[in-house]
Amino acid sequence: MSNKKILIVEDDADVRLGYKILLTAHHYDTFFAGDAIAAISEAIMHQPDLILLDLGLPAGDGFIVLERFRANMNLALIPVIVVSARDLKEDKERALKAGVKGFVKKPWNDAQLLALIKRFLGQRDPLVLDRMAGHWQ
């Protein structure tokens, strides 16, 4: 059985290292994008089973990245969990309305993050497909 693939969209090298240590210890394959532009190309290239997305990114914020994921037929169904230092109620509501599966505040709790990952890993969201069907026709 192959390992599940997780794309981490995060600009901070220390945080990326933290993800790598945590997730490889739990047998996940990790791929990284350090900005909004790389996020789309890495997602298309690797077709991850799940995406962890920071909101504060260079070259466009996480909401722009999320919109681009949802607008791409090959990426729209991949579950996304936001992991961000931005902890505003408005950000959480906007992210959940955009279809993210969860919102985790940095610094994250390993057990909480792993539980969310396990819960949503590989789970394609038919509601997103229904919402986007008109866009793709």
Predicted regions and their residues:
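Active-site beta3 strand of CheY-like receiver
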Residues: 46-52, 57
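The feature encodes the CheY-like receiver
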Residues: 58, 76, 88, 107
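Conserved acidic carboxylate
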Residues: 10
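Acidic catalytic/metal-coordinating carboxylates
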Residues: 35, 61-67
